[in-house]
Amino acid sequence: MAEAYDILIIGSGIAGVSAALSCRNRGKRVAVVANSLESQSLYKAEKITNYPGLELTGRDFAEKLQEQLDNCGADIIKGRALSVLSLGDSFGVAVGNDFYEAGAVILALGITRENLYPGESEFLGRGVSYCATCDGMLYKGKKVALIGSSAEAVEDVRFLREICSEVLHFPKPQRFEISGGMKVERLKAGQEEYAVDAVFIIKDSISVSKLADGLERDKNGILVDRSMATSIPGIFAAGDCTGKPYQLAKAAGEGNIAALSACEYIDKKGV
């Protein structure tokens, strides 16, 4: 028999942890499907400078979030959610070979980046960044490169040129390779190689998860309303999987809103 919860949260980044804390504060029985701490992009961030009241490394921040999650009373399910199925008045969630039931589901999936450049994953948090406004000040007065052609990328180039000594902008697709020692030192673009201190990669990345049939999405991510409700009643979404901006404060706030909305949904059903 499937184990049943009031609310099941898929994802244990800041949006998922925020949602779990808020659901537990409302007295709900909660489970969180969590990947390893080390696999989270937050864990690899060099420094967190854009979250109010905190200034610490991504690893320290991620570990504090994990500690809060471990102590909040939610059940932690290690693994990867494979599907979310409607069971009428509830949802079934497959995680590996196990099956769980919940009255409501919160998707806090983050984003999945595909077609990584050589060196991109290796140097993430050590000179590779996906957010110029988050990490740009770490490279004040230094030489950086930005890969991207979107309107957001153009704005980021303008921002970086105000604080960096030199900004190399690569708007056209080509073969890129990032290399260095402990940190980024070089970017190879085509046949040319450039000495840089950081590489900002601005992609239109979205979650590629297709967990639930009928879940409406656009090019930015899962479509939600102001209550973080998706197109499927009882399924809510929060954080990077709902689209830009990819910011910690946004993810935390959306996690809280999704949790309160899910709790209200459960209460109205009388689950």
Model-derived regions: residue spans:
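FAD-binding core/adjacent interface of flavoenzyme oxidoreductases
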Residues: 1-8, 26, 75-142, 186-189, ...
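Beta1-alpha1 glycine-rich phosphate/pyrophosphate-binding loop at the start
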Residues: 5-60, 68, 142-172
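Glycine/Thr-rich phosphate-binding loops of Rossmann-like dinucleotide-binding domains
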Residues: 40, 115-116, 154-155, 209-210, ...
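A Rossmann-like FAD-binding core segment of flavoenzymes
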Residues: 63-64, 69-88, 92-94, 100-102, ...
